[in-house]
Amino acid sequence: MHPRFQTAFAQLADNLQSALEPILADKYFPALLTGEQVSSLKSATGLDEDALAFALLPLAAACARTPLSNFNVGAIARGVSGTWYFGANMEFIGATMQQTVHAEQSAISHAWLSGEKALAAITVNYTPCGHCRQFMNELNSGLDLRIHLPGREAHALRDYLADAFGPKDLEIKTLLMDEQDHGYALTGDALSQAAIAAANRSHMPYSKSPSGVALECKDGRIFSGSYAENAAFNPTLPPLQGALILLNLKGYDYPDIQRAVLAEKADAPLIQWDATSATLKALGCHNIDRVLLA
């Protein structure tokens, strides 16, 4: 079991501990549960889906990286496929506060970058901030997304985001988590190709500035993040954050990164290079390359 889970695991009910122990035994537990695993946990504990998601939140929150606030938030995004995806907030010392990742963004990106097609619900241990409510409104599940909070009845996103402004107001038809392929040819080595593939999946209807980041760890594992724009602009999630979300949730740490590649267009209206390289350097990675999409 990864050390970060030990404290939260010890506080779970005995029957949930017994059912989870073989799942969490792998140090690189992928911070997700398949539909089959969810069904097995429900049978072992007698909990329904909502109660099980709440019971698992401490494990999601244990994935948080909060050196600034020490305020850990966990989220679980429930995919329409039946898979549940953990998420947690992340802060980066030496970067800017704008680089911060919220737990809801983490769980949603985890699902999206894992190939999930849509979300049915999201469970969070604290009320989503306005930033996250706006981020969720970019999803193809839209205002119908169910939000579950401890001690409250479940409500749709529309109940938390009154008079919402979103992609439909800007006549955007392709939404976050819809399948997208911008068709750039995969060239270069495996890491460069992973970055280009991530750029091809970008959701960037507002700036038309595709970008993707791929991180290579010392053991050869590659994590890729795609750019995810938002109708309100500021809740946009950069591609580096997507890659860092996966790296963190899959049990890796920043010192494990040995090389990074950013793929973007040289003449794009928005450029990721400066922010990406600055944040990576703050995390200790200085081997950073840029591949131009053409």
UniProtKB/Swiss-Prot annotation:
Membership in a protein family: Belongs to the cytidine and deoxycytidylate deaminase family.
| Signal peptide interval | none
Q: Indicate which residues the UniProt annotation says bind substrate.
A: 89-91
Enumerate the Pfam families for this protein. dCMP_cyt_deam_1, dCMP_cyt_deam_2
A GO molecular-function descriptor: cytidine deaminase activity
Q: What residues bind Zn(2+), as annotated?
A: 102, 129, 132
Cofactor or coenzyme needed = Zn(2+)
Query: Quaternary structure per UniProt?
Result: Homodimer.
Per its record, the protein catalyses: cytidine + H2O + H(+) = uridine + NH4(+); 2'-deoxycytidine + H2O + H(+) = 2'-deoxyuridine + NH4(+)
Show the active-site residues: 104
**What are the EC numbers?**
3.5.4.5
Record-given protein name: Cytidine deaminase
Q: Which part of the chain is the CMP/dCMP-type deaminase domain?
A: 48-168, 186-294
- What does this protein's UniProt record list under function? This enzyme scavenges exogenous and endogenous cytidine and 2'-deoxycytidine for UMP synthesis.
* InterPro entries attached to this UniProt entry: APOBEC/CMP_deaminase_Zn-bd, CMP_dCMP_dom, Cyd/dCyd_deaminase_Zn-bd, Cyt/Deoxycyt_deaminase, Cyt_deam_dimer, Cytidine_deaminase-like, Cytidine_deaminase_bacteria
Q: Which UniProt keywords apply?
A: Hydrolase, Metal-binding, Zinc
Q: Which CDD domains does the entry link to?
A: cytidine_deaminase (cd01283)
| GO terms (BP aspect) | cytidine deamination
Q: How is the cofactor bound?
A: Binds 1 zinc ion.
The organism's place on the tree of life at top rank: Bacteria
User: One Gene Ontology cellular component annotation?
Assistant: cytosol
Supply the source organism for this entry.
Escherichia coli O157:H7
